[in-house]
C-alpha cells in the first residue's frame, strides 16, 4: 500500500503546475499547500466514513487492516482508502486550474496549515463534489452515498446477507482477511 501511495502522489506532483510542486505526502503539519488541502479534506472525509460505519452498525474502532487499538478509529482508517479520491479530485482541480491562493495557507513550525480562508474555499468545493450524482451499483447516487452503501453491504456480509457483495478493493481485502483468519483458527465464517 505504501509503495502504491508513493507512486500515486509522485505522479500527481508531476501533473500539477510547477508553482505548486510537492515532495510526496506529508501531514502533521503538511510541508506544502497541496498536502495542507489534502489533510483538511481527509479530515472531513474521516468524519463522513465514521458516520457511515456507525449507521451501518459497524464499530469504527475495530481494526482489520490497521492495528486493532481501541484508542484509534482503526476501521475508519481501513474503510476510507477507496474513497480518498473524493478529496483528491477537487484538490487536484484547485491546483491544476490555478485556483489556489497563497492566503489559503499559514505557516506553522516546520510546515503549513490551511488558513480560515483556505478552509472556506475548500469545504464548499468538497461538499459540492460529494453531492454530485453518479452511477454507482446500478443506481444514481450522490458520490458520498457510495460510502454508506458500501458500509451497509459490508455489515450485511458480516451477518451472512451476501447478495451482490461489493467488489471494491477494500472489501476484497477485508473478505480475504476474514476468510483466512477464520479458516486458520478452525472457526466458522461470520
Language model: regions and residue ranges:
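Active-site helix-to-loop segments that bind/position phosphate- or nucleotide-bearing substrates
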Residues: 1-190
Amino acid at each position: 500500500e505504501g509503495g502504491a501511495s508513493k507512486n500515486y502522489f509522485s505522479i500527481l506532483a508531476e501533473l500539477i503546475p510547477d508553482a505548486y510542486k510537492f515532495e510526496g505526502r506529508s501531514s502533521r503539519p503538511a510541508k506544502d499547500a497541496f498536502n495542507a488541502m489534502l489533510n483538511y479534506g481527509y479530515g472531513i472525509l474521516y468524519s463522513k466514513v465514521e458516520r457511515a460505519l456507525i449507521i451501518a452498525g459497524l464499530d469504527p474502532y475495530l481494526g482489520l487492516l490497521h492495528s486493532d487499538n481501541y484508542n484509534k478509529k482503526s476501521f475508519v482508517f481501513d474503510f476510507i482508502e477507496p474513497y480518498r479520491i473524493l478529496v483528491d479530485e477537487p484538490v487536484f482541480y484547485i491546483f491544476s486550474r490555478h485556483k489556489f491562493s497563497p492566503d489559503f495557507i499559514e505557516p506553522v513550525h516546520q510546515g503549513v496549515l490551511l488558513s480560515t480562508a483556505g478552509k472556506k474555499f475548500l469545504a464548499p468545493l468538497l461538499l459540492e463534489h460529494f453531492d454530485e450524482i453518479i452511477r454507482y451499483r446500478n443506481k444514481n447516487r450522490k458520490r458520498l452515498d457510495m460510502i454508506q452503501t458500501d458500509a451497509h453491504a459490508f455489515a450485511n456480509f458480516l451477518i451472512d446477507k451476501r447478495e451482490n457483495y461489493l467488489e471494491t478493493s477494500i472489501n476484497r481485502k477485508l473478505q480475504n482477511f476474514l476468510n483466512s483468519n477464520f479458516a486458520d483458527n478452525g472457526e466458522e465464517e461470520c
